[in-house]
A protein has these predicted regions:
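Metal-dependent phosphoesterases centered on the DNase I-like endonuclease/exonuclease/phosphatase
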Residues: 1-78, 82
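Hydrophobic/anchoring residues in structured secondary elements
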Residues: 55, 97-100
Length: 120
């Protein structure tokens, strides 16, 4: 697909926390969404030529896009970053902003935003 359409943005709920920084409790290695094989898949996907736009611009920021409805997780910020805007490598230098709208409370997930500065 990337050969036919080299400039891709693939956004959505991947249901995986890629790195320890993406989950409130990195000791949860045996829980679906943070299993080693899921994290390996995500790493392989990124290595295939995609950029995690949020992490590219926010290397140290610990923010989440999902909170369980149980145990008052959102109020206690016990979240997971499961939602991604993956950008193909040719668009990497076009990423101008990437952020999470964590104040939006319409769902257990909140919106993510990526802004690309593309010259037409």
């Amino acid at each position: 697909m990337k050969q036919e359409i080299p400039n891709l943005v693939i956004c959505g709920d991947y249901n995986v926390c890629h790195e320890e920084i993406d989950i409130h409790n990195p000791k949860m290695k045996g829980v679906s969404g943070f299993l080693p094989e899921e994290r390996t898949w995500m790493g392989d996907f990124i290595k295939s030529g995609f950029i995690d736009s949020f992490r590219y611009l926010n290397q140290e920021k610990q923010e989440y896009s999902w909170w369980s409805y149980r145990a008052n997780s959102r109020a206690n910020n016990k979240g997971w970053r499961l939602d991604y805007a993956m950008v193909s490598e040719p668009l990497k230098n076009s990423i101008s902003r990437a952020y999470i709208l964590s104040e939006a409370k319409h769902s257990d997930h909140c919106p993510i935003v990526v802004e690309l500065d593309i010259k037409l």
